[in-house]
Regions:
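A short, flexible beta-alpha/helix-coil linker loop
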Residues: 103-105, 125-127, 159-162, 194
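Active-site HxH/HxHxD metal-binding segment of metal-dependent hydrolases
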Residues: 28-90
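Cap/insert and terminal regions of metallo-dependent hydrolase folds
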Residues: 136-223
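Active-site neighborhood of phospho(di)ester-bond hydrolases with catalytic His/Asp-centered motifs
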Residues: 3, 36-46, 65-68, 129-135, ...
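Short gly/ser/thr-rich secondary-structure transition/capping motifs
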Residues: 19-27, 45-48, 79, 133-136, ...
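Metallo-beta-lactamase
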Residues: 66-126, 207-230
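Pre-active-site segment of Zn-dependent metallo-hydrolases
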Residues: 1-41, 52-55, 107, 137-147
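Acidic/glycine-enriched edge-of-secondary-structure segments
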Residues: 7-14, 127-132, 154-168
Length: 230
């Protein structure tokens, strides 16, 4: 999301209908954010991942990677010319990317919420990274952890949900479940406190991790924070 604070209405049928999205301004100018960026990787096309401002601001020659042909056509319709679908072994330089199972809600919500994807990044000299994306904790995530054995995991765990159908991504309790299923991995928890239908705060994740005894490997970046040493 690159739009200014409050430029979009709240997500309907959810909590905090008095709040407009995004809830905060960007921590630094868009120009700084895009400096040095040569690839955009999209898990899906919901407004809290890529908004109209992003379509307008990102240079049209930017290289995009998306989950499927439908998303490719949508992104191209905004004037972008270099849009590719992630396959079984898509490469960016020496980094290999492949899709991982993902489900954006329970049996009620997964259809209206639409398709989404996780991604796994591998490199001969780097740790395997699994970006779970917008998914609930379910059997597919367990399979991903067993299949790819990631050493670094990024989790969207803001507990975003709707009055009918419940949550569409993980929450703080699910962070503990992932940590138990991947006992040697570092976890980076994101997608927090940014939009109206978030229900989990950084402090909630921190307290849950502390009680579970996993705070030493659960990291909760602040807005604008860059993590380099994984």
């Amino acid at each position: 999301m690159l739009g200014k604070k409050g430029c979009m209405p709240p997500f309907p049928f959810s909590r905090n209908q008095h709040l407009r999205n995004p809830l905060h301004e960007l921590p630094f100018p868009v120009e700084k954010m895009l400096k040095g960026v040569d690839v955009v990787l999209l898990t899906h096309l919901h407004d809290d991942h890529i908004d109209e401002a992003a379509y307008e601001i990102i240079p049209k020659d930017m290289r995009f990677f998306v989950q499927d042909e439908n998303d490719r056509q949508v992104v191209m319709s905004h004037g972008f010319n270099h849009v590719e679908v992630v396959g079984d072994n898509t490469r960016i330089g020496e980094v290999s990317i492949q899709k991982a199972e993902s489900q954006h809600g329970n049996f009620i919500m997964k259809y209206p919420a639409g398709h989404t994807a996780g991604y796994v990044f591998t490199h001969p000299q780097e740790k395997t990274l699994y970006h779970a994306g917008d998914t609930i904790w379910y059997a597919g995530v367990k399979r991903n952890l067993k299949r790819f054995r990631p050493e670094v995991i990024t989790l969207n765990a803001g507990g975003n949900g709707f009055r009918l159908g419940g949550r569409v991504i993980m929450n703080d309790e699910d962070v503990v479940k992932v940590a138990a299923a991947a006992p040697d991995a570092k976890l980076f928890v994101t997608h927090l406190e940014g939009v109206n239908h978030n229900s989990v705060t950084r402090e909630m994740v921190r307290k849950r991790a502390e009680v579970a005894g996993i705070l030493d490997r659960v990291f909760i970046p602040e807005d604008g924070e860059t993590v380099e040493d994984l």
